[in-house]
Amino acid sequence: MQSNNPFLKNKSFEKPQVIQVDEEGNRSVIIDYNETMTISGTINKSLIMLLILVVTATLTWTMTATGYNPMPFLIGGGLIGFVLVLIASFKPHLSTYLAPGYALFEGLFIGALSAIFEAMYPGIVIQAVGATFTTFLVCFMLYKYKVVTVTEKFKSVVIGATITIAIYYLITWLLSMFTSFQPVHYGNSLMSIGISVLVIVVAALNLFLDFDQIEKGAQKQLPKYMEWFGAMGLMITLVWLYVEFLRLLSKISSRD
């Protein structure tokens, strides 16, 4: 099984085949090494996306603090970001344009969401940011020094857990929308906190899949636009992780 992340699918990360046939009918693979995916290039794209996200999130936060309604940013940014994700998952060659756009609109979403949580629990945003990047660095070091190796079994377990979480969230959201059902992960009970911790663990494990696919994409010398594609997939995981940390910290804070 491959990563459930729409930006880390099998077909997108297959090695490109550029075939040249000479006059005698001999076939050879031609690759332009100046136009292929690299790890350093993906890192640079990830940093550019992070900068865009931080700038737009900061602007949204500032506007919300001065009296603007955060809901248009929250809903609009989230929906448009989701649409860009869907388009890029089917048209990865457009990632050069879609990835920066995703970072921009996701910044609107993150800025509005952060402002809402910060208003309720002062100091929670810096804690969530710190927890997110600490988790990222720990996972990166564990992957870099081969403490954690991404095997097929590892992928299967992580993907299965992630799909289960997605289905659970979708079903409970629909039930809560149209019935009086109260999902167990709502509120600040110990069980709810435990579920949040479990989801954070699964989100963190997805980082290993992201690292593995980016590394293999570079090894396979994929097209240059796959740097944006890989960076976009990594950004999705980081945003998910940050949102889950916000939720966990808010549950803990509300118990005080």
What are these model-predicted stretches?
Residues 1-256:
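A hydrophobic alpha-helical transmembrane-helix feature that marks the membrane cores
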